[in-house]
């Protein structure tokens, strides 16, 4: 079974998906980590961190590197790179590289292969997960929150010197990019269960999703 969790950046997708995985015994995958690894590959190649590589160059570089999810960690050429992809430098470019159709096709293919090859239960989170990657998911959730709340959450997670105002502006830019992508844009699927997480704690959101999951499970098992 697949529980697909969609929504904008910092809406709580990763934290809630991880907590749900623990409570339900499902494996957790974040599509965003794949895009962040691809952005890391680009930044390691580029002499200037602000340069944006072409789609053809990105696809060439990705083909020369090995990106894997082993069930627990995200690996680049056999090395766990989680500590290298959760920072402002990656934040700055990840939405731009993830807008490339070729890049999205690679990530979507990897996600589908993981689910297909391993007969297991998954919670998969990311933008366009409910609309493009797993439109057939048994449970589809869309998490949302105001920009101010999302910026504050991101601010509390960070250890660098970025300001709250800078994070709010960055999220607004990212929302605009994600909502206007040619392919895989952020949007509400008509079958999703919408949850505004702005003023809900993690446990409350998890309880809502588990209730939805249990109702769906009963329907499937009839």
From Swiss-Prot:
Catalysis performed (reactions): CMP + ATP = CDP + ADP; dCMP + ATP = dCDP + ADP
Enzyme class: transferase
Major localization class: cytoplasm
Keywords, sorted A to Z: ATP-binding, Cytoplasm, Kinase, Nucleotide-binding, Transferase
A single GO molecular function term of this UniProt record: dCMP kinase activity
Binding site for ATP: 7-15
EC numbers on record: 2.7.4.25
SUPFAM superfamilies, per database record: P-loop containing nucleoside triphosphate hydrolases (SSF52540)
Pfam family, one: Cytidylate_kin
A Gene Ontology term for the protein's cellular component: cytoplasm
Subcellular location(s) per record: Cytoplasm
A GO biological-process term: pyrimidine nucleotide metabolic process
Presence of the UniProt keyword DNA damage in the record: no
Family: Belongs to the cytidylate kinase family. Type 1 subfamily.
Name assigned to this protein: Cytidylate kinase
């Amino acid at each position: 079974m697949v529980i697909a969790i969609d929504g904008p950046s910092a809406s709580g997708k990763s934290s809630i998906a991880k907590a749900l995985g623990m409570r339900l015994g499902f494996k957790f995958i974040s599509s965003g980590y794949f895009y962040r690894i691809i952005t890391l590959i680009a930044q390691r190649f580029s002499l200037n961190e602000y340069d944006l590589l072409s789609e053809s160059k990105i696809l060439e570089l990705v083909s020369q590197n090995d990106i894997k999810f082993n069930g627990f960690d995200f690996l680049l050429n056999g090395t766990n790179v989680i500590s290298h992809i959760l920072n402002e430098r990656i934040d700055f470019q990840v939405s731009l590289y993830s807008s490339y159709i070729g890049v999205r096709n690679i990530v979507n293919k990897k996600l589908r292969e993981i689910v297909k090859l391993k007969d297991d239960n998954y919670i998969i989170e990311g933008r366009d997960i409910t609309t493009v990657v797993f439109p057939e998911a048994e449970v589809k959730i869309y998490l949302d929150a105001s920009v101010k709340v999302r910026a504050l959450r991101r601010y509390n997670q960070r250890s660098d010197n970025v300001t709250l105002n800078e994070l709010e502006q960055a999220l607004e830019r990212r929302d605009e990019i994600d909502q206007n992508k040619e392919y895989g844009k952020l949007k509400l699927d008509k079958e999703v269960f919408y949850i505004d997480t702005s003023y809900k704690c993690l446990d409350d959101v998890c309880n809502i999703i588990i209730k939805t999951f249990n109702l769906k499970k009963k329907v499937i098992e009839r």
